[in-house]
Amino acid sequence: MNDIKLKVIDLSKWNGAFDFITVKASGIDGVIIRTGYGIKAPKQVDNRFEQYYKGAKAAGLYVGAYHYCYAKEAVNAVKEAEFMLELIKGKSFELPVYGDFEEQGKLSKTVCTEMVKAFCNKLEASGAWAGVYSYDTFFKDKLAADIPKRYTCWVARVENIPPKCVPAESVGIWQYSWKGSVNGIKGNVDMDYCYKDFPMLIARKKLNRF
């Protein structure tokens, strides 16, 4: 793997309320926040997204976002991407914006590949640095080999050994723990290592300004 550039945590409403300034002081560089899940519906917005976004920005943390996807075909993956774009409108992000694909493990590689491409391409058409999140075996067994070359990968492998399911240069972020501890947050926290200088790259390309 490449050198670690940033220490990141990922968040959803389940992390509750906390002080982002304390989080930053503990050595965390950035956060990736869940926007919501599925196709557009009022109850499918993460009710901490706005609060977390404002708190992280005010604390000077780098911010990214992810949308939890339930789609089982490409047409619905596009609808989920459209929902995400509505939720991030008017915001800017220093880290990529991701589709989170964990519910599609029983589908074929062809269908999974088509869905990831449809979701990410929809985001890219709006000026996003788009990526895909999933567990390591999903990348290995359910996605075509060109996906890691085309989109940045955020790979979950909660072991001491970095993921080898995609080429090392394609792993932008490695989620290495679901049971981390961070000052200012009660309970377990998802922990991530970021291997690319996304803030610099995204700023240079003038992306993620919605």
Language model features by range: what are they?
Residues 1-120, 124-129:
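Substrate-binding cleft of extracellular glycoside hydrolase catalytic domains
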Residues 79, 138-148:
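Glycine-rich, charge-decorated loop segments at or immediately adjacent to ligand/cofactor-binding or catalytic sites
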Residues 50, 64, 131-133, 174, ...:
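Intrinsically disordered, low-complexity segments enriched in small/polar residues
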Residues 40, 72, 139, 162, ...:
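Flexible, glycine-rich phosphate/dinucleotide-binding loops
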Residues 38, 104, 137-138, 160, ...:
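Short, solvent-exposed loop/turn segments at secondary-structure junctions
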Residues 1-15, 22-25, 144-210:
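Functionally critical loop-and-helix segments that line ligand-binding/catalytic clefts
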Residues 67, 134, 157:
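Short beta-strand/turn micro-motifs composed of small residues
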Residues 127-139:
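Aromatic-lined carbohydrate-recognition surfaces of secreted/lumenal glycan-active proteins
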